[in-house]
Amino acid sequence: MPHRCAAQVVAGYRSTVSLVLVEHPRPEIAQITLNRPERMNSMAFDVMVPLKEALAQVSYDNSVRVVVLTGAGRGFSSGADHKSAGVVPHVENLTRPTYALRSMELLDDVILMLRRLHQPVIAAVNGPAIGGGLCLALAADIRVASSSAYFRAAGINNGLTASELGLSYLLPRAIGSSRAFEIMLTGRDVSAEEAERIGLVSRQVPDEQLLDACYAIAARMAGFSRPGIELTKRTLWSGLDAASLEAHMQAEGLGQLFVRLLTANFEEAVAARAEQRAPVFTDDT
């Protein structure tokens, strides 16, 4: 499946050996591609460090309204790379336990950056999402899978725990506790068809339609108010952590008032409907 599709590679975002690519396939859309297909885009530190850098730069690129995250070749991400883990930066003279902590923190940062990104993130899951790759997909706001994709909580198969990189937090919230327990404790594969049925992904599409389906979702979101989209993403995530309904409604209400009182977006929406045209939100008064 072609992932470059005449998109422009932004030189400023490219790592030295292009293990992470950032392209602009459509206006206001950035596509971040894990580009190590010979290792099924495994989460080696040589890939995760430039991914973290790319996310940081895209976050402050105000021309980007939506991010699409995908993998090159036939896989989304196979998770940990047991043969070529890469190099963790800034670990000189550290003992093995501290080195391990720095390694874990780096991977944790990537997951949290996806959540904190100003822009919505769509995971275009183009193939296997295994172990940490499943975690990476779950950290996105929206997931769309190709028909050939599948998902596996692989830690349990490797004699470890299946709980890593927020998986035991994110998966039950996505699909419910019983299904999450079963998938994580058995380490079985979840097909794209099943993933769609249980809500792990929003939809599955034929392989060749994956990116276009994601671009269509992204383009729709990009047409809405910037603070409206950003605050909706923020409250959706904070809702997963909310201690009470009352506290969360307060946060929602403040966000709604912020956009309603400080912009003319609502008036524009009403006028656009009356005039039977698409609204143009300026996010200003």
From Swiss-Prot:
SUPFAM superfamilies: ClpP/crotonase
One GO term (biological process): fatty acid metabolic process
Keyword terms: Fatty acid metabolism, Lipid metabolism, Lyase
InterPro entries linked: ClpP/crotonase-like_dom_sf, Enoyl-CoA_hyd/isom_CS, Enoyl-CoA_hydra/iso, Enoyl-CoA_hydra_C
MF terms in GO: enoyl-CoA hydratase activity
Signal peptide: none
CDD domains the UniProt entry points to: crotonase-like
Reactions mediated catalytically: a (3S)-3-hydroxyacyl-CoA = a (2E)-enoyl-CoA + H2O; a 4-saturated-(3S)-3-hydroxyacyl-CoA = a (3E)-enoyl-CoA + H2O
Transmembrane segments: none
Highest rank taxon of the organism: Bacteria
Coiled-coil zones: none
Keyword Ribonucleoprotein: no
Enzyme category, top tier: lyase
Enzyme nomenclature, EC number: 4.2.1.17
Function in brief: Could possibly oxidize fatty acids using specific components.
Family according to the record: Belongs to the enoyl-CoA hydratase/isomerase family.
Protein name: Probable enoyl-CoA hydratase echA12
Gene: echA12
